[in-house]
């Protein structure tokens, strides 16, 4: 299943854009609130309620509908504060320069651990353009836990 945890619709009527009257309840405030290329909102993975919401979403699809895996959409956008826009990614310094979103990396790692705990045969695929080292390495080996990386 294609799962989109990289961003959310800005709509306030049928989306999370202004849930309970707070436009930042699930999303980053300020300059990081909106994705500059997608006209959508960016989840704040450092908030407990966001982490619980997204992780429970993964578990729901696995438990209730018996999906056997996920292709995570827009992973590059999650990994970097710049969303990977305009970045070259030619050497390790481009990946690990303090511009990576540690909260998003934590979420992706926890999501992979959860998915593989609920269904040890589940497959996770990261749609990702930067080639982030360790993305498709097992958590036990120091990676983020994805089974595959889909280069775009």
Residues of each region from the PLM?
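Substrate-binding/active-site clefts of carbohydrate-active enzymes
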Residues: 1-100
């Amino acid at each position: 299943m294609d799962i989109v945890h990289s961003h959310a619709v800005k709509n306030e009527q049928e989306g999370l854009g202004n849930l309970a009257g707070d436009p930042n309840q699930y999303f980053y405030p300020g300059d990081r609130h909106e994705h500059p290329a997608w006209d959508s909102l960016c989840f704040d993975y450092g908030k407990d309620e966001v982490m619980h919401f997204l992780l429970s979403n993964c578990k729901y699809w696995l438990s209730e509908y018996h999906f056997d895996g996920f292709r995570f959409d827009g992973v590059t956008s999650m990994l970097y504060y710049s969303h990977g826009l305009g970045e070259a990614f030619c050497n390790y310094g481009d990946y690990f320069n303090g511009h990576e979103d540690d909260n998003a990396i934590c979420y992706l790692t926890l999501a992979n651990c959860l998915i593989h705990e609920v269904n040890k045969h589940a497959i996770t695929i990261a749609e990702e353009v930067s080639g982030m080292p360790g993305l498709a390495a097992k958590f036990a080996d120091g990676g983020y836990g994805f089974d595959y990386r889909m280069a775009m």
